[in-house]
Amino acid sequence: MLTFIGLGLFDEYDVSVRGLDAIKSADTVFLEVYTSVLMGAPIERLEAFYGKKITPLYREDVEIHADKILDAAEFGNAVFLTAGDSMVATTHSDLRIRAADRNIPTTIIHGASITTAVCGLSGLQNYRFGKSVSVPFPYGKWFPMTPIEVISANLKENLHTLVFLDIQKDKERYMKISEAVDLLEEQARRVDAGIPLYVGIARAGSPEPTVHAGNAEEMKAFDFGSPLHILIVPATLHEIEREYLERFAGLC
């Protein structure tokens, strides 16, 4: 059996009761650490809370060397833990398909997801979001333009854009909102586009999340504090959305 369990957004206390029961009864516990991380709970705290040894998994462990996971699930009870909700990342869907190819039973226990948490924190209506996009760290001469293309297409349809910021867990490197805004502004400059407003969110799901809305210069000057950070590029605001951002995100 392979059970996919979403752990929620911030620390060890965000897992559901059903998820916790499944972890405690598992023979093998894997934790995927490359699409997102629980910043409020290092792996040692998770192990202490669950009473289980946890094997961390990086991208190649899941996408290339998944047999270790599948073997554990074929011959025992394995759980595959992720921050947020398990099936938001395509790579996790692929793992479930490969398990089915080997006739391994699978099940999903959902957790809170950043894709819905940002709506509560920002007040932006979830049905008004278009395609999401990720901003990676540039590498050498590689400077992808996909983010501004997606944002521009969404704005044309009057849709908000959720912008994920790069995570390099193996290097303990987490993109900041100020870095992402710099990259997006450079992309916008290259295609003669404009981004009039951003909403930045830090540490969603924690006891003290930070939310701030403003233009590029305001966002780069604002101190969002420690990671994880995420961005939204809003379309034209509904009056309720605007009032929410004014009250809870410092929008002027």
UniProtKB/Swiss-Prot annotation:
Pathway: Protein modification; peptidyl-diphthamide biosynthesis. It holds the Pfam family TP_methylase. GO terms for biological process: methylation; protein histidyl modification to diphthamide. Its EC number is 2.1.1.98. S-adenosyl-L-methionine binds at L9, D85, V88, S113, I114, L165, A204, H229. SUPFAM superfamilies: Tetrapyrrole methylase. Keywords: Methyltransferase, S-adenosyl-L-methionine, Transferase. Gene3D superfamilies: Cobalt-precorrin-4 Transmethylase, Domain 1, Methyltransferase, Cobalt-precorrin-4 Transmethylase, Domain 2. It comes from the Archaea. It catalyses: 2-[(3S)-amino-3-carboxypropyl]-L-histidyl-[translation elongation factor 2] + 3 S-adenosyl-L-methionine = diphthine-[translation elongation factor 2] + 3 S-adenosyl-L-homocysteine + 3 H(+). InterPro entries: 4pyrrol_Mease (IPR000878), 4pyrrol_Methylase_sf (IPR035996), 4pyrrole_Mease_sub1 (IPR014777), 4pyrrole_Mease_sub2 (IPR014776), Dphthn_synthase (IPR004551). GO terms for molecular function: diphthine synthase activity. Belongs to the diphthine synthase family. S-adenosyl-L-methionine-dependent methyltransferase that catalyzes the trimethylation of the amino group of the modified target histidine residue in translation elongation factor 2 (EF-2), to form an intermediate called diphthine. The three successive methylation reactions represent the second step of diphthamide biosynthesis. Homodimer. This is Diphthine synthase.
